[in-house]
Design a protein with these regions (language model features):
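Beta1/beta-strand and adjacent pyrophosphate-binding region of the FAD-binding site
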Residues: 1-14
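Short amphipathic alpha-helical face segments that pack within enzyme cores
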Residues: 17, 50-51, 155, 159
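Gly/Ala-rich phosphate-binding loop of Rossmann-like dinucleotide-binding domains
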Residues: 19, 23-24, 163
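Glycine-rich FAD pyrophosphate-binding loop
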Residues: 23-43
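Dinucleotide-binding Rossmann-like beta1-alpha1 core, especially the glycine-rich loop
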Residues: 47-133
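Helix-loop-beta segment of a Rossmann-like dinucleotide-binding subdomain
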Residues: 129-167
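A conserved beta-strand/loop element that lines the FAD pocket in flavoprotein oxidoreductases
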Residues: 168-175
Length: 175
C-alpha cells in the first residue's frame, strides 16, 4: 500500500488547486474524487473570475487587490480558458447608489488594479444606451462599463488537475 504526504478528497477547484500546490512543493500527493473532476460544485459556479468589485463596499481593500491580481494571473496563465468580458452597471433615479458613488467605486477598482487595462472603466455616453437590448431607458441616469473575466469552470478545474498530475500528484476520479 502506497503512503502519501498529502491526501485530498474532492476534485473541485479547491481540491485540485491544493493537489497542484502540494505536488509542486514536492509532497507525494493523492487526490480522490468520487465523480468527474470539476463535475460537482465547481461546475455550477457563476463562472466568473471576478476582481471583487462588490467587496469595495464593505471595505475589503486587500481582498479586492488580491482578487484583481489573481484574475490577471489567470488571464495570463490560461488565456484559452479565461476571457475578459465587459460588464455594465445602469444607474437609475431610484438606484441605491448614485452615479458619483459608482464612479468613485470604479475609480478605486482601477487604482487597486494598478491601472491594468481590465481594471479601467468608462461612462457609456447616453447616445449609446439604446444599443443595450432590454435596458429600461426611463429614469436612467448613467451607464458604466467595466471588465471582469469568465471561464468554463469545469475545464479550468480539469486543467489544474492535469497540471497537478504533471507535477507528480496521483489523481483518481470516478472511483
Amino acid at each position: 500500500m502506497a503512503c502519501f504526504d498529502v491526501a485530498i478528497i474532492g476534485g473541485g477547484i479547491s481540491g485540485v488547486g491544493i493537489a497542484q500546490y502540494a505536488a509542486a512543493a514536492g509532497y507525494s500527493t493523492l487526490l480522490i474524487e468520487k465523480g468527474e473532476i470539476g463535475g460537482q460544485t465547481s461546475a455550477n459556479s457563476s463562472k466568473l473570475i471576478h476582481g471583487g468589485l462588490r467587496y469595495l463596499e464593505t471595505g475589503q481593500i486587500n481582498l479586492v487587490r488580491k482578487s484583481l491580481l489573481e484574475r490577471r494571473h489567470l488571464l495570463n496563465l490560461a488565456p484559452s480558458l479565461v476571457k475578459a468580458v465587459p460588464f455594465y452597471i445602469p444607474v437609475y433615479d431610484n438606484s441605491q447608489r448614485s452615479p458619483w458613488t459608482i464612479r468613485a467605486g470604479l475609480s478605486m477598482y482601477a487604482l487597486l488594479s494598478e491601472f491594468d487595462p481590465l481594471g479601467q472603466f468608462v461612462s457609456v455616453p447616453a447616445v449609446h444606451w439604446h444599443r443595450f437590448k432590454g435596458l429600461k431607458l426611463s429614469g436612467l441616469k448613467a451607464v458604466f462599463q467595466y471588465w471582469d473575466a469568465q471561464t468554463d469552470d469545469k475545464l479550468l478545474t480539469q486543467a489544474v488537475a492535469r497540471s497537478a498530475q504533471a507535477l507528480g500528484a496521483e489523481v483518481y476520479a470516478e472511483a
